[in-house]
Amino acid sequence: MAKKGKKLQDAAKLIDRNSLYSAQEAIELAQKTSTVNFDATVEVAFRLGIDTRKNDQQIRGAVVLPNGTGKTQRVLVFAKGEKLKEAEAAGADYVGDAEYIQKIQQGWFDFDVIVATPDMMGEVGKLGRVLGPKGLMPNPKTGTVTFDVTKAIEEIKAGKVEYRADKAGIIHAPIGKVSFSAAKLVENFLAVFDVVQKAKPAAAKGTYMKSVNITTTMGPAVKIDAANVVVK
């Protein structure tokens, strides 16, 4: 553990904690200071000036990253009739109804995302206590409760990520892997930055984006100069 700690300390020395970096600089530094021996995930964290206790200041949604996440998402679809066949044709990993509800109740979680048609939500809703804490409950805001299962599956497979402000007003979202080129990570970052910026609640007061950091798995945080981020 001491060796890992020294690696992180050495990596952190490359970053000036008092400086704000451009997106390009921050991402390149995050890549350079990744100390783990696997292809780490690169993540962005937004600290927002919102009061999440108020319903009109909740932020939740999804965005398709232009260059994907670098991770293959396993999709479970709850549907009936023709929608079952449509989901299979679109590339869903698991498709069904009651049998998968039972499997989940018994502790099965070999999937990453659930898509459900609206007519299945009465049944899927029974899994709320199990799926909710894991962030797996389908939601219309993230496009995972829909009759257009083909579009939902294609977007997820293409690299759609969900984002949600936690109680402290912080949003975490993956933007790819350390092995990605910096240019691809910047494009993915800008896609997330754009939707979070546009999601500012009308009722939010004061500074909206209080801080924006780039990190890698177990790596140090690099601060981004959010005021000068330009989304083309």
From Swiss-Prot:
UniProt GO BP: regulation of translation; translation
GO molecular function per UniProt: rRNA binding; structural constituent of ribosome; tRNA binding
Domain of life, source organism: Bacteria
Keywords on record: Repressor, Ribonucleoprotein, Ribosomal protein, RNA-binding, rRNA-binding, Translation regulation, tRNA-binding
One Pfam family it belongs to: Ribosomal_L1
Cellular component aspect of the GO annotation: large ribosomal subunit
InterPro entries hit by this protein: Ribosom_uL1_bac-type, Ribosomal_uL1, Ribosomal_uL1-like, Ribosomal_uL1/biogenesis, Ribosomal_uL1_3-a/b-sand, Ribosomal_uL1_CS
Summary of the function given for this chain in its UniProt record: Binds directly to 23S rRNA. The L1 stalk is quite mobile in the ribosome, and is involved in E site tRNA release. Protein L1 is also a translational repressor protein, it controls the translation of the L11 operon by binding to its mRNA.
Entries under NCBIfam families matching the protein: rplA_bact (TIGR01169)
Quaternary state and interactors: Part of the 50S ribosomal subunit.
Family: Belongs to the universal ribosomal protein uL1 family.
PANTHER family, A to Z: 54S RIBOSOMAL PROTEIN L1, MITOCHONDRIAL, LARGE RIBOSOMAL SUBUNIT PROTEIN UL1M
Protein name, per record: Large ribosomal subunit protein uL1
Species for this entry: Lysinibacillus sphaericus (strain C3-41)
